[in-house]
Amino acid sequence: MGLSVLAVGILLSGTLYIMSVDNSLMGQVIRKQIDNGTDMGRFVPIDAPNTPMGVARGIHPGRVAWAHDPKAAVWDGKRGLYSDPDNNSQTRVDDMMEGVIIALTRQNTIDKAWDELFRTFNYKKGKGAVKYKKGEKIVVKINLNDNGGTNIIDATPQSVYSLLHQLVDIMKVPQNCITVYDAQRRGISAVYDYVHPVYPNVNYQNWGGFVPDVIRYSSEITDAGARSLARAAYEADYMINMALMKRHSEPTDKWRDSAGQTAITATGKNQFGSIGNVPPLHLSIRDWSSFRGMGTYNSIVDLMAHERIGGNTLVYLVDAMYVNPKHNGKAVRFQLPPFNNGWTSSFLASNDQVAIESVVLDFIYSELPLCANADNFLHEAANIGNPPSGIAYIGKEQGSLGVHEHWNNPTHRMYSRNLGTGKGIELYRVPLNEKRPAIEYFYADENALHYKTSHAEEVRLNGKRLEDAEGIIPLSISKTTAFNLEVLVNKKVTSSQRVVVRRLEDIGICQAKDMERQGSAFLNEDGSVEFKGEKGSSEGSVSWKVNIPHKGEYYLVVSYTGGNPVPSYLYINGEKISENIGYLATLGEKRGEGKGGKKWIGKQCIS
């Protein structure tokens, strides 16, 4: 059998951005926007409750579906990670995801609901009311702002799993036609570790791979990197925007860049992870700035209107399992009913981006203060054809990107369509039964399967009945094996979950001492390789080579410890075959920390 030479390279570099620049508004140069040390103010809506603006979108116009199950997110806030499988019920996440998708349509089953979403989307795109066709590409933009693998809130792995389950297992979308990505961030570890064993052929991407000169901005922004779009998004037939419920900035009267740029991060700012250079957009989204305010340009509106971003979005989802109080914050509990000092443990979905952003803003504002002018971008988007700013947005011919309004109060959460007083938003609560049969958790470690079920008459593992509702089953397998756990009522399966335990053969180990080192990479006495130099200034790389078969499948397991994750690339016979196979990161910040922490595992098929 012939051999190829595989090379893996790791690169470390730093970049400094200067944030105070002259910017142009409506074709005129305005004074330099310098926000350091200034007051972000506090948000007070200028529009009264239940006074909708814009034109509602969706099969049910203006509908935002909301599902809440307090037993879905059960992390105690202290032990382990919020993303751990025993802290989130896959069954309950599946039910919430299914509930909000069905609620957006006129259907009563999840397969028919997705089919209607695809057909409606294609009809509006001028393709006719056709269903999904095998081979069409779907991208899922998730939020990995903090690189995954810590208790700073990112996309919940169980949420990504649930979406892939619906697309792959129910709608029969080929795994290799799906890409899950955040092109602006350095890690996908927690999501990848949980999801990849079951869906190994899905494309999991983070940093890299941009198509130049795709995005044009209506004002201010001319940077070439900001005009580039992630290749995955550019080539997709369908975009699924899977955001978080996140307050981006904690208001302060002495702003610094670390405080954050804008009020909230939901489906709008989530797309900053799709563009090649983000800092040039920051000035334009500081609606709280004394240089801006209500009725001013906001670049998020351009992304919402863009044909390859907002215009290519099949559905908007908000993973609200845990609310992040700041762009790099840890989960915060909500006090008001139905949360009752608990996690939000929710999902939202809509076909109207302005509406779902408005609802996310209202939820956050009901519990946390926001910086001034938090909904300026929604006023602009709802009225893009004739916005308060007077900006001639590139997407102005759309007239409106959706409907915006504020609910009547944080207790009743009623919008104009709920009240029957207008054609604004409808917040639809998906009915759920907390006492339904469920798999509360099911996962594997190196030695055993761990499971817990509730309200089941019978529990089966790979078709064999288990005597206990919860337990630990020792593992003794010599090859990769799939395990399927089922809960039954009246002999009928009501919930199931699959776990795949991988066993690798022909394992080869590449020692750090065998690496080729360049620049700031040094070999330590203990045999590890370290990048030395001041933070943000050291530049270097390490690489190693291994012979592999011309065809087949292989996995790479790379252990790396450091506070600054670094990118890595694959080369075969000298040719780079990946934009970036992933940033490597662990929980430790110093050499020797992070034992047993996160490892990067990548798979590459050679043909």
Located regions from the model:
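Proline-enriched interdomain boundary motifs that mark the N-terminal boundary
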Residues: 434-442
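Edge beta-strands of extracellular beta-sandwich domains
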Residues: 492-503
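Extracytoplasmic
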Residues: 504-607
